C-alpha cells in the first residue's frame, strides 16, 4: 500500500487540476468572445476618424455654424476609442490571469510528480486504467495546455 502512495498523490493532484483547467478554458473562451465587438468598434472608430480628417468642414455650408464641430467630433471619437482600449486592457488582464492560473496548477502537478518520481513505478505511470488515461498521457496533455496558453500570451 505504501508503494501506491506516490502514484495516488500524483493522481490526486491531476484529478484536482483538470477541472480548474476546464473552468479556466471557459473563461478564456468567453473573454476572447468579448474582445471581438471591442475590436470591431475600434476598427469602426479608426475609419470614422480617418473619414472626418478627409472632410473640410468649413467647405460644407450646413456645418459652418458649428466652427468647433470637427474638433468636438474628433474628441468624442478618441474618447470612445479610449473606452474600448480600456475594456480590451481589462480583457487582456483576464487572459493573463487565466494563463497564470493554469500554469500554476500545471506546475503544482509537475512538482508533485518530481517529488515522488523516484518512488513511482514506470509501468504504473504508463498504464491507463479503465476509468482514466495513463498518468504519462495526462502529464503530456498538461504540458501541451500550458504551452498553448504561454505561447498565446508570452
Locations of the language-model features?
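Long alpha-helical rod scaffolds of large eukaryotic non-enzymatic complex subunits
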Residues: 1-154
